[in-house]
């Protein structure tokens, strides 16, 4: 397996900086900032001595970047006022060139895996119970992946499949998320969250809440890190399963097949050391028609753009 980490430094205001997305355009704001950080906790990153030398030029995307799809909502437009951010499917994992010289800003690179919704035991239908806190262990397992607990054996039969690329089971895609600047936060908010609608899929689409054909049955995997300054908040609202780990410990636990559910973590409550860099790992699963909601809102100052593991079977 090959790990690619896309490094970026922070902006002066201490807000979230994410991603390694599209090239700067007329909507961007170029910024030049110091880089370097250190940490030695169990989930922190030892990135060396702090440097006062200028870091890479970053482009804060204040408008939807070229080639991105704006976050989608209800067909009747009733939730148009809350939609924020957007996404861009870069391409299939394992078929992309190594990134180089990419400017980092509020674009976050993730892995999404497309499953055949009704051919996997964990996808395609309601599970009992619908809310399943404690579905995964409270600490990250090997490879920075969640480990299934012994609870709710019928809710997730093959959870190890969700965040692994497996021939005949799923197809992995590299996707960039644009988090839109909103006040002092950055937000991605979609009530019709279907980034993989246009990828080639062997299965027929299912109808969403508006009767529109959609590609259900997918997971999202994010690995990044942030510099803790004090006062930061990370909020996720969505369906179905969502697990967020900070410093290797579970801080948002929304397991099960259910409607939109929200979890918030105040970083000050985690007993971290200010000035150090800590890992953040997010895992999401959309398992059941007809709804798909996804909202991230944060004031975190991310220290890198995300890391991608090429685990495509050779």
What are these regions (language model features)?
Residues 1-18:
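Sec-dependent bacterial lipoprotein signal peptides
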Residues 17-62, 66, 71-72, 79:
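Ser/Thr-rich, Pro/Gly/Ala-heavy low-complexity intrinsically disordered linkers and tails
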Residues 61-230:
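Extended carbohydrate-recognition surfaces in non-catalytic/accessory domains of CAZymes
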Residues 231-244, 280:
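Aromatic-lined ligand-binding clefts that engage carbohydrates, nucleic acids, or primary amines
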Residues 241-253:
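Short, surface-exposed beta-strand/strand-loop-strand elements in extracellular ectodomains
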Residues 250-267:
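Short, solvent-exposed beta-strand-to-loop segments that form ligand-recognition rims
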Residues 275-277:
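Extracellular Ig-like/FN3 beta-sandwich strand-entry sites
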Residues 281-291:
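Short beta-strand-plus-loop segments that form exposed binding edges in beta-rich domains
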């Amino acid at each position: 397996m090959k790990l690619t980490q896309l490094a970026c430094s922070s902006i002066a205001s201490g807000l979230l900086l994410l991603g390694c997305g599209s090239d700067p355009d007329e909507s961007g704001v170029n910024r030049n900032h110091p880089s370097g950080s250190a940490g030695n906790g169990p989930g922190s990153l030892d990135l060396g001595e702090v440097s006062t030398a200028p870091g890479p030029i970053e482009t804060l995307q204040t408008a939807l970047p070229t080639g991105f799809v704006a976050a989608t909502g209800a067909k009747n437009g009733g939730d148009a006022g809350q939609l924020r951010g957007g996404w861009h499917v870069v391409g299939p994992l394992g078929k992309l060139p190594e990134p180089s010289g990419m400017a980092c800003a509020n674009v976050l690179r993730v892995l999404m895996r497309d499953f055949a919704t009704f051919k996997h035991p964990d996808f395609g239908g309601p599970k009992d119970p619908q809310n399943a806190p404690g579905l995964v262990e409270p600490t990250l397992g090997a490879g920075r992946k969640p480990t299934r607990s012994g609870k709710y054996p019928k809710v997730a039969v093959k959870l190890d499949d969700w965040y692994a690329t497996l021939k005949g089971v799923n197809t992995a895609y590299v996707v960039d998320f644009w988090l839109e600047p909103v006040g002092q936060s950055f937000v991605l908010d979609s009530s019709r969250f279907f980034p993989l609608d246009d990828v080639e899929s062997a299965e027929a689409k299912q109808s969403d809440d508006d009767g529109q054909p959609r590609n259900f049955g997918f997971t999202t995997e994010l690995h990044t890190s942030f510099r803790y300054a004090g006062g930061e908040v990370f909020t996720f609202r969505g369906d179905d399963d969502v697990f967020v780990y900070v410093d290797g410990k579970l801080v948002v636990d929304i397991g099960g097949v259910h409607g939109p559910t929200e979890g918030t973590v105040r970083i000050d409550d985690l007993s971290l050391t200010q000035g150090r860099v800590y890992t953040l790992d997010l895992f999401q699963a959309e398992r059941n028609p007809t709804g798909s909601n996804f909202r991230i809102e944060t004031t975190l100052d991310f220290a890198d753009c995300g890391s991608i593991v090429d685990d495509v079977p050779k």
